[in-house]
Amino acid sequence: MQLPWWWELGDPCAWTGQGRGTRRMSPATTGTFLLTVYTIFSKVHSDRNVYPSAGVLFVHVLEREYFKGEFPPYPKPGEISNDPITFNTNLMGYPDRPGWLRYIQRTPYSDGVLYGSPTAENVGKPTVIEITAYNRRTFETARHNLIINIMSAEDFPLPYQAEFFIKNMNVEEMLASEVLGDFLGAVKNVWQPERLNAINITSALDRGGRVPLPINDMKEGVYVMVGADVPFSSCLREVENPQNQLRCSQEMEPVITCDKKFRTQFYIDWCKISLVDKTKQVSTYQEVIRGEGILPDGGEYKPPSDSLKSRDYYTDFLVTLAVPSAVALVLFLILAYIMCCRREGVEKRNMQTPDIQLVHHSAIQKSTKELRDMSKNREIAWPLSTLPVFHPVTGEIIPPLHTDNYESTNMPLMQTQQNLPHQTQIPQQQTTGKWYS
């Protein structure tokens, strides 16, 4: 008897000697069955809500393990799958993300990261990000929504901001919570503020940097901006010294006393550090004075009348055609005068040409004319200059070859030369002897 598919998930049947006994599920199999059902129905997840603060770095990791269970065939408990998964993120209803939000995923086998610094304009407005995961092996997709609820910060923006350039880090490495925490701890030891936040992280490639060579584990570099509520420390101010500025202009490393606190993990380019004091910046914002929204009275509007006066275009038509025609006629007359009235003539040319040159030219023309006439009519007798006069052996005078009833036009050239009636074949004498090479 064939059992239902759902019953095969249970414990194998326990048969008694009398026949079929009671069938049941073991606790382990029951847990497996419930886990499978939960995995199948967990494809429909609820939207995830996050609450970042404006002006503070926001980091959200898209974990591959979170999406692996949503691609069929669903993995069994304890089974590990390593399918390549990529992510596509966009603002709901739009093809791309908001301007302040960035996304990076180095390889399909690594997690994706959403990061950025929320702006104050989006405070109180939920930002819905659609996250679509693609399984590159099975071509299955899964979609979730990330709702970003931006909260207002207490002291936004922080008045003192410093931007560091770290040469031995990539963006995805710096976004790790442990690495970012270690960097903020080192900055806090140097700066010693009461409040310190990471404001933004930017890759050096986004600032015009070059892609590093794949040798010696070279990194792209990353810019990290932090903000604090106290003025800059004396160590950070050392970058502004004239001696250090001179060394930076000569592409030499400046001498910073607190560099050893970062050197153990972070290689900072102190020549690219930027210190911004918001308290000394003069605000250029001008308050907009709003009016009443009423346009000044310009009188009653008077549209043009419907009955327009007729306009005569005859004069314009004549001017348009007459002027180009007159110019063309003048040019034609000038060209005709040059070509017809300014010619020297044949008589004048012959008078200025020497007689011997004219005779030579006339002979050439006569010969050319005779050859053309001969090519047109081949039935006439050959020129006497081309016929043999004396016999090559006897010396007798040979009568004319062509008679009136002789068709020379149908005779091949070789035949006329070989089968002449008064022509004697002259045997060729062959010389005997040895050939020497």
Curated annotation (Swiss-Prot):
Location in the cell: Cell membrane, Sarcolemma; Cytoplasm, Cytoskeleton; Cell projection, Dendrite; Golgi apparatus
Cell inner membrane keyword on record: no
Domain of life according to the entry: Eukaryota
Record PTM: N-glycosylated.
Alphabetical keyword list: Cell membrane, Cell projection, Cytoplasm, Cytoskeleton, Glycoprotein, Golgi apparatus, Membrane, Transmembrane, Transmembrane helix, Ubl conjugation
Region of interest called Disordered, as start-end residue ranges on this chain: 418-437
Residues linked to a glycan: N200
Pfam families: Sarcoglycan_2, Sarcoglycan_2_C
Its membrane topology: Single-pass membrane protein
Cytoplasmic domain ranges by topology: 339-437
Membrane-crossing segments per the record: 318-338
InterPro entries, per the entry: Cadg, Sarcoglycan_alpha/epsilon, Sarcoglycan_C, Sarcoglycan_N
Extracellular topological domain: 1-317
GO cellular component: cytoskeleton; dendrite membrane; Golgi apparatus; plasma membrane; sarcoglycan complex; sarcolemma
Role, per record: Component of the sarcoglycan complex, a subcomplex of the dystrophin-glycoprotein complex which forms a link between the F-actin cytoskeleton and the extracellular matrix.
Family note: Belongs to the sarcoglycan alpha/epsilon family.
Record protein name field: Epsilon-sarcoglycan
